[in-house]
C-alpha cells in the first residue's frame, strides 16, 4: 500500500480535445473521479496539472475549472506544471497570485527548463505561496531538463 501517489491530468483545453479526444466536461469528470477514488484509497494524493501554464494562457477559465475539480476531490496538493518550459518568472508569479484567491488547496510547481527558467520559476513560485517543488538531481529530465534541486 503506498503512502502517497502523484497523478497527472490535462488542463489545457487544446490537449483535452486533440490528445484525449473527449469533451471538456468529460475531462473534468475524469479528473474528479480519478482523484476522488485515489483519495479514498491512498493517504496523500498529489495532482500534477499538466501543461497548466499553457492552458491558463489559452483559456484561464477552463484551466481553473480543472484545478477546482481536483480540489473538490480532496487532493493534498495541486502542482502547476510548466510542461513545455516556456513560462517566464513574472508569468508564474502573476498566475499563482491570482490562483491563491480561488484555490485553497496547497499549490506546487513542476518546471521544465526549455527557456532556462526552471529554477527561477520554482523559486518565484515558492515566493508566491507554492509549498511543493518537483525537480531532479542536476536538472536531468526530458528535453532540456527540470528544475535542478542541487
Regions found by a protein language model. Name each.
Residues 1-107, 122-130:
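Alpha/beta enzyme core
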Residues 9-11, 128-145:
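Glycine-rich phosphate-binding active-site loops on the catalytic face of alpha/beta enzymes
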Residues 13-15, 86, 116, 139-144:
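Short gly/pro/ser/thr-enriched loop/turn and capping motifs at secondary-structure boundaries
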Residues 48-50, 81, 110-112, 136, ...:
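Structural motif
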Residues 64, 116-119, 146:
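Glycine-rich phosphate-binding loop at the start of an alpha helix
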Residues 92, 144-150:
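Histidine/acidic-residue-rich catalytic or RNA/ligand-binding cores of hydrolases
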Residues 110-137:
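Small-aliphatic-rich amphipathic alpha-helix that forms the alpha element of a beta-alpha
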Amino acid at each position: 500500500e503506498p503512502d502517497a501517489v502523484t497523478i497527472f491530468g490535462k488542463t489545457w483545453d487544446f490537449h483535452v480535445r486533440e490528445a484525449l479526444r473527449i469533451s471538456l466536461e468529460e475531462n473534468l469528470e475524469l479528473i474528479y473521479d480519478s482523484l476522488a477514488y485515489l483519495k479514498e484509497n491512498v493517504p496523500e494524493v498529489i495532482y500534477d496539472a499538466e501543461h497548466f501554464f499553457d492552458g491558463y494562457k489559452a483559456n484561464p477559465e477552463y484551466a481553473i475549472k480543472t484545478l477546482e475539480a481536483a480540489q473538490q476531490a480532496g487532493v493534498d496538493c495541486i502542482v502547476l506544471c510548466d510542461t513545455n518550459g516556456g513560462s517566464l518568472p513574472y508569468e508564474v508569479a502573476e498566475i499563482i497570485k491570482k490562483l491563491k484567491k480561488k484555490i485553497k488547496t496547497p499549490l506546487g510547481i513542476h518546471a521544465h527548463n526549455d527557456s532556462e527558467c526552471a529554477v527561477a520559476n520554482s523559486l518565484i513560485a515558492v515566493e508566491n505561496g507554492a509549498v511543493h517543488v518537483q525537480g531532479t538531481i542536476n536538472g536531468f529530465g526530458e528535453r532540456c531538463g527540470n528544475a535542478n534541486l542541487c
